[in-house]
Design a protein with these regions (language model features):
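Hydrophobic alpha-helical membrane-insertion signals
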Residues: 1-32
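A ubiquitous short alpha-helical element
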Residues: 3-5, 51-55, 430-433
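Basic, short loop/linker segments at the boundary and entry of helix-turn-helix/winged-helix-like folds
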Residues: 27-69
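Anion-binding and metal-coordination hotspots
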Residues: 68, 75-88, 99-502
Length: 502
């Protein structure tokens, strides 16, 4: 007996008398409908100004922006793959209005409008705030490394650049000398030719030398900006493909990357501030982060939490006068050992010393004073104890580690009072409870961004990569808004997002 499987609908092999709407095949609650409603509200006037009335009509910037945002939300980043989806995927067809922009159009728009994508991110954050999805009550800041569009194998150290530049210069001079000699000796025999054909070889070497010089000059400028007047270490490297990317470590691996910084609101994990940094660590990222939050939302948060990577004098100083209740975790070396000094043989660390701001000195566990010995124009300070007091102290073996027998020395800077206050604040149980929020606020967001497939940049150069990072952050916010609408947390009223009334 033949099993009666389901048959294909008759419309599959026969044309219907009346055309049907192909989008009826999509579920009524498909996310592309919500994205389309949101995209209609995007302000693209700043990009529209760059188009001309002459020539062939261009795709509207709002359409291209919508396609890119929707594509990133679906984990599609290749411009060729996006074009393909516009031909094959119903959701993409709806977002693109049955248009299929060439991959070059998509790629060039993404490459040439990095400033607009920052504005696009701002609109996503404000839209979320208007929908009641972010309140700036508690914001957490964190950073993560994103791979640059280059390779460690397309790089060279400063020492090798200098050596290679000299070698190529010598080789080119040698080739030119040989060519001139051949011209003189064989001009009559070969007439228009030298008889010793080398132009192509010379051309290749000259191109290589130009690239070497360009990379060397870029590295010298970078190091001069970072360390004015200091000699450049021969081990410093630069990438030929993306000269603005930096070698950064992540879980024991090193690669050319950028440091993506995001400030995330507690309410619904909306990103309210973002920027891309070339710094490998987070020691100086608070000031630009606060500026971005202010520029994006027009205000600053009531509370902020940051991990111990931000525990630096410069970062803490950035909060001065901002009226933000800040919680910064102390580093492993800055946490007090709970074991009593008297009842254990543990080493005495810097954190065991109390700083007296009024007298500008440190007091050791034995009650001796470490006075200020030297101070530089950059704010670096060195405090040192009295040698006779240290020699007679019963803690000396656990405290003084100098092989020369010098008294206990503490190296710090003029920001020490700020660090001490933060350490004391973070020892309180109430502070620890507030800080616990951080793990649930910002860390999952990086996971969500990377789970879509965005782990590195398609564009090169800090400005263009910053634009792509802004786009990725805007996509995250739009995904949250769409999820909120589909989940009933927010609704559309009169074409605008508004909180759902419960």
């Amino acid at each position: 007996m033949q099993i009666p499987f389901k048959k294909d609908p008759i419309e599959f092999k026969q044309r219907a008398l009346f055309a049907t709407n192909v989008f009826d095949l999509l579920p009524s609650d498909h996310q592309c409908y919500v994205y389309e409603d949101i995209f209609e509200q995007l302000d693209t006037s700043s990009v529209e100004e760059q188009f001309s009335v002459h020539g062939q009509n261009a795709f509207h910037p709002r359409l291209i922006t919508g396609i890119l945002i929707y594509a990133y939300s679906q984990g599609v980043f290749s411009s060729r793959e996006i074009e393909k989806r516009c031909h094959e995927d119903l959701g993409f067809m709806f977002i693109s209005h049955f248009n299929c922009p060439n991959f070059r159009v998509l790629s060039d728009f993404r490459k040439d409008n990095h400033e607009f994508f920052k504005e696009c991110f701002k609109q996503s954050a404000l839209l979320a705030m208007e929908a009641g999805m972010a309140s700036l009550g508690h914001v957490s800041l964190d950073g993560s490394k994103f791979k640059a569009n280059t390779s460690k194998h397309k790089a060279m150290s400063y020492g090798r650049l200098k050596a290679k530049e000299k070698d190529l210069t010598d080789e080119i001079e040698d080739l030119i000398a040989k060519a001139a000699k051949c011209d003189e000796e064989e001009d009559e025999e070969h007439q228009d030719k030298s008889g010793y054909e080398i132009p192509e070889e010379l051309k290749i070497k000259e191109k290589r030398l130009a690239k070497i010089k360009e990379a060397k000059e870029a590295l010298e400028k970078r190091e001069q900006d970072l360390n004015p007047g200091k000699k450049i270490d021969d081990k410093k490297q630069i990438s030929f493909a993306d000269k603005e990317a930096r070698i950064m470590g992540k879980k024991g691996n090193f690669d050319y990357s950028y440091n993506g910084q995001i400030s995330v609101d507690e309410d619904n994990q909306i990103i309210v501030g973002q920027h891309l940094s070339q710094n490998a660590n987070d020691k100086r990222e608070v000031e630009p982060a606060l500026e971005e939050i202010k520029e994006t939302t027009g205000d600053l948060p009531d509370e902020m939490s940051l991990d111990n990577g931000y525990m630096s004098g410069n970062n803490l100083e950035s909060f001065d006068g901002k009226e933000i209740d800040v919680y910064v975790a102390t580093g492993k070396g800055e946490k007090k050992d709970q074991r009593p000094i008297e009842d254990s043989n543990r080493k005495i660390k810097k954190v065991d010393f109390n700083y007296d701001e009024s007298k500008d000195c440190f007091v050791c566990p034995a009650g001796h004073t470490l006075k200020l010995r030297t101070e530089t124009n950059e704010g670096k300070k060195v405090y040192q104890g009295d040698k006779s007091a240290c020699d007679l102290c019963h803690y000396k073996a656990r405290c003084c580690s100098s092989k020369k027998g010098e008294p206990r020395t503490i190296h710090t800077d003029d920001k020490e009072p700020l660090r001490q206050k933060m350490r004391e604040k973070m020892e309180q149980e109430s502070s620890k409870e507030i800080y616990k929020k951080r793990k649930k606020i910002v860390e999952p967001v990086f996971g969500q961004i990377k789970n879509t497939g965005f782990r590195g940049f398609s564009l090169r150069g800090c400005k263009k990569a910053s634009g792509e990072f802004s786009l990725a952050c805007a996509v995250h916010n739009f995904r949250k808004i769409v999820k909120g609408i589909l989940g009933g947390k927010v609704c559309l009223e009169s074409g605008e997002l508004a909180p759902t009334v419960v």
